[in-house]
Amino acid sequence: AVLVVGVALAGLFTASVASILIERSLRSREVPNIEMSGHLVLCNWSPRALDWIREVHSSIVTDHRPVVIVHDTPDEVVLPDKLDEAAFNDVYIVKGDPANEVILRRAKVAQAYSVVILADDRQERHADGKTIVCCIAVKNVCVQERQPNIVAECQDPKYRQHMRKAGA
């Protein structure tokens, strides 16, 4: 019985330490409370996003812009350490649904240079619908401001015209 309790306590301790480290890592990537403008906003997360970030932050790109990732499950956003790969030095995370206008305001979408909306792979056949809703939400947030460029990933070509009408 003592052995079982000891193993349980060790597991609890390890889980607590891991949770603290993950939370600290996520906090270091929160959007700073400064006026950010001209940045890139990436809505939704997928492994394809890593290559996209590497491309926009590559050494051949002279116009370096910070990247703000908006995703409802930040634990899924797995980024290389800032010290290991320079492309990820200026990458921040906003937790929340990218179709939610409050969350988009927190990501400072109205001041963004461009917004890239990736298809949410978890939505399967409804991914394009969610992408269209995200496009509309971005337009609504930016109604008084200059509209950022909106680029949206379309999985089914039959929804392409709907995405264009939504602002992509």
Segments and roles (model prediction):
Residues 1-168:
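Cytosolic regulatory regions of ion transport systems
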